């Protein structure tokens, strides 16, 4: 989160525009531009816990993490800089929340990579603000307008659900497995035997699909679910509640907020951060697993077959095995021995 993203570089081309503004930065923010850009006030709202961790070190209480922006978050702000995500429903969800709280007459800047669909911004907010494209660079578009009226934001209308066997999965925009069980998770689940016991950590839990399915055929497991995405945390809590299942669900940047040890760690680890490919989280997941597993405990993950995880698994655990694979995915298993690196 050190180098500026292309979207932030476009904002920097207009840095003089912001020196007297009280700015709220929100959306798919992936760098520390709010801490670097000269403004009268810089405040951040993010749904990504790992981004909040970094920005809060510099911005302190002006960095906010959570599912929704609050009136307090937007208090005294006269400008919104919104980073367009790769997921259109997520953008709609976040923008309606933000514009419902932003004072009428405030300036709105929307920036994002062309391939992420930022062109949709004009039509999406047309009922409340007229956006015009003011710059195009670094394969990004920058749009500007003023808020003419506030939308009504009803968070309940953005919830979705789908059946999975006898389970109900609850989801919000921007959450992995929002539209159904993905092939990778299905492959991982097929390797889990029924009637398992012990403490299980689900890292990058998304909508809680893996944990809910596991608990449905192994009711004695004790579940801990974590994710960086506030929408995923809310979705997982809702999925467990909808199926009368129990588990601890909270935000953690891989192991940042994890204490204790587990008998199994399961994950379908992400390798995209926004629209950029990143293996950092998955490698942190593997390398840190031995510090959070009991001796004899195992890490079981599913990943795209082309990703370079075998070497990291062997360096960390001493060995690994491929439990199952198809043309696209592999399910890896690595067991913590007494000799495993810590």
Curated annotation (Swiss-Prot):
Catalytic activity: guanosine(1207) in 16S rRNA + S-adenosyl-L-methionine = N(2)-methylguanosine(1207) in 16S rRNA + S-adenosyl-L-homocysteine + H(+)
UniProt-listed Enzyme Commission number(s): 2.1.1.172
UniProt-recorded Gene Ontology molecular function terms: 16S rRNA (guanine(1207)-N(2))-methyltransferase activity; nucleic acid binding
Keyword Cytoplasm: yes
Compartments, as annotated in UniProt: Cytoplasm
CDD domains: AdoMet_MTases
Enzyme class: transferase
Keywords attached to this entry: Cytoplasm, Methyltransferase, rRNA processing, S-adenosyl-L-methionine, Transferase
A GO-annotated cellular component: cytoplasm
InterPro entries: DNA_methylase_N6_adenine_CS, Mtase_sm_N, rRNA_ssu_MeTfrase_C, RsmC/RlmG, SAM-dependent_MTases_sf, Small_mtfrase_dom
Pfam families (UniProt xref): MTS (PF05175), MTS_N (PF08468)
Self-association and partners: Monomer.
HAMAP family: 16SrRNA_methyltr_C
Job of this protein: Specifically methylates the guanine in position 1207 of 16S rRNA in the 30S particle.
Family membership noted in the UniProt record: Belongs to the methyltransferase superfamily. RsmC family.
Protein name: Ribosomal RNA small subunit methyltransferase C
Organism: Erwinia tasmaniensis (strain DSM 17950 / CFBP 7177 / CIP 109463 / NCPPB 4357 / Et1/99)
């Amino acid at each position: 989160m050190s180098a500026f993203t292309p979207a932030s570089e476009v904002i920097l081309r207009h840095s003089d525009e912001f020196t007297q503004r009280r700015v709220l930065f929100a959306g798919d923010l992936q760098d520390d531009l709010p801490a670097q850009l000269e403004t009268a006030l810089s405040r951040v709202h993010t749904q990504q816990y790992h981004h909040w961790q970094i920005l809060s070190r510099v911005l302190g209480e002006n960095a906010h993490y959570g599912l929704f922006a609050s009136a307090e978050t937007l208090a005294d702000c006269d400008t919104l800089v919104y980073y367009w995500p790769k997921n259109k429903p997520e953008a709609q969800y976040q923008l309606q929340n933000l514009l419902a709280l932003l004072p009428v007459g405030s300036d709105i800047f929307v920036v994002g990579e062309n391939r992420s669909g930022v062109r949709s911004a004009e039509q999406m907010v047309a009922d409340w603000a007229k956006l015009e494209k003011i710059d195009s660079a670094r394969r990004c578009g920058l749009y500007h307008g003023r808020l003419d009226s506030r939308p009504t934001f009803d968070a309940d209308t953005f919830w979705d659900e789908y059946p999975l066997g006898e389970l109900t999965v609850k989801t919000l925009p921007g959450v992995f497995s929002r539209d159904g069980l993905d092939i990778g998770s299905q492959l991982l689940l097929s390797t889990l035997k029924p009637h398992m016991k012990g403490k299980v950590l689900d890292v990058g839990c998304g909508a809680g699909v893996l944990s809910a399915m596991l608990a449905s055929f192994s009711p004695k497991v004790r579940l801990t679910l974590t994710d960086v995405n506030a929408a995923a945390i809310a979705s997982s809590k809702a999925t467990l509640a909808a199926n009368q299942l129990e588990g601890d669900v909270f935000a953690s940047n891989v192991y940042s907020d994890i204490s204790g040890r587990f008998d199994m760690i399961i994950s379908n680890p992400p390798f995209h951060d926004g629209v950029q490919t990143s293996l950092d989280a998955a490698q942190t997941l593997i390398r840190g697993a031995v510090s959070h597993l009991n001796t004899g405990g195992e890490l079981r993950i599913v990943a795209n077959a082309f990703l370079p995880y075998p070497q990291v698994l062997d360096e960390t655990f001493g060995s690994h095995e491929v439990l199952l694979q198809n043309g696209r995915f592999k399910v890896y298993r690595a067991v913590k021995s007494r000799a495993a690196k810590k």
